[in-house]
Amino acid sequence: MKIDVLSLFPDMVQNGLSQSIIGKAIDRDLIDLEVTDFRDFSVNKHNSVDDAPYGGGAGMLLRPQPIFEAMDQVNAKNPGHKRVILLDPAGVTFNQKVAEEFAQEDHLVFICGHYEGYDERIRTLVTDEVSLGDFVVTGGELGAMVMIDAISRLVPGVLGNEQSAVTDSFSTGLLEHPQYTRPPEYRGLKVPEVLMNGNHKLINEWRDKMSLKRTYERRPDLLENFDLTADQQKWLREIKQETAEK
């Protein structure tokens, strides 16, 4: 997968994505990351990329010229189809489903904003406007790095165990079940017996039920449009009954 990032702070993005699993994926050429400082395309004598908004108002806006010309360079190097993602608090909220959709693409471009916002004409370059959530941060770099991490994990070969991406929270539509490792007991806290009895049918059933229970307790909104199996419907009734009796 080819990923371009247009940013005023390229070192921040490069350093943030050069670590751990994503860094190894870049080293193995599974992810081709290129970060461009769009300040390099500024044509005014002060090398600035922002200006005051027409009509007045607080803050400064990113001017279209540097970003348009940075995109011209991206398109010249790779003229094929690409998804161009604008990091914007007003965009659609990023989630696992969006990550899975973007992971199917061959080429992604992230435009990281700064200052008060963008000249509206910049939006004509983009295919998607995406936000991390209902809050505002100083720039788009952190959001881009989070999204790139989530997307890259879904690229074949990036994770050592492909099943990890399948069983992660949200990949199944539910939160992940509790997990345990050695020792079997620590400070009076014991690993559930079912996980140590070797019966994989019972283990899988326990995991499925605990995943449903954790989702009901922490993110019940995820169940609103979730198509429950007959077993899950039965477990959910039991979970609700247990909760009511507490």
UniProtKB/Swiss-Prot annotation:
GO biological process, one term: tRNA N1-guanine methylation
GO cellular component entries: cytosol
UniProt keyword annotation of Transferase present: yes
Gene3D superfamilies, per the entry: 3.40.1280.10, tRNA(m1g37)methyltransferase, domain 2
Subcellular location: Cytoplasm
One of the Pfam families matching this protein, by short name: tRNA_m1G_MT
A GO molecular function held by the record: tRNA (guanine(37)-N1)-methyltransferase activity
Enzyme Commission code(s) on record: 2.1.1.228
Keyword Ribosomal protein appears in the UniProt entry: no
Binding residues for S-adenosyl-L-methionine: 113, 132-137
Function: Specifically methylates guanosine-37 in various tRNAs.
Subunit structure: Homodimer.
Protein name: tRNA (guanine-N(1)-)-methyltransferase
Species assigned in the record: Latilactobacillus sakei subsp. sakei (strain 23K) (Lactobacillus sakei subsp. sakei)
